[in-house]
């Protein structure tokens, strides 16, 4: 990646859901402009906690989170959205009672401008959503809901997209489709943090990756290097290798 200031820099962050009980224990993490960075690790490692802390759903107990040069630690999520970061959670990531089109409109809630062109861009990117634009989101398949959640986030043209377990509960075919969309979003210049349980697939597409364990960043490196690291493979990729 080019030599430039990181778009996101997490420095020595401690965070958790209860005061004095830290799940994240001194995590350091960075994303360069335009990078796709994977965050992998076993269940309970703190991956989703890291995503929620970055996006302001949890306030870090200590440490800093610099986004585009500004310390956003302690900011509310709506303020972080306006700074240019969007988040797609693992579950409850669409408004099931609203139509596909209404979901996209909800994604543009902070914009004071016409949004039809933005919706058209999303429908061009996700043709299946265009076909179902008047259907309620609750009637969509799991893969279609994931595409809708990403599409809603992209309505704001974020500088950084934070994805929490986008492959969760999807069939292998749908996983491939969703991951190809993630690749394409990144190719077009959006930096992506991919928090993902499917470690092998995440590292295959990542510029760099981090391995979390027990709330600490145990390994960091290029995605290809982590894939080929015997220790990472033994500890975290064994199940994936068996398939």
What are these regions (language model features)?
Residues 63-71, 83, 115-117, 121-124, ...:
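Conserved ABC transporter NBD signature motif
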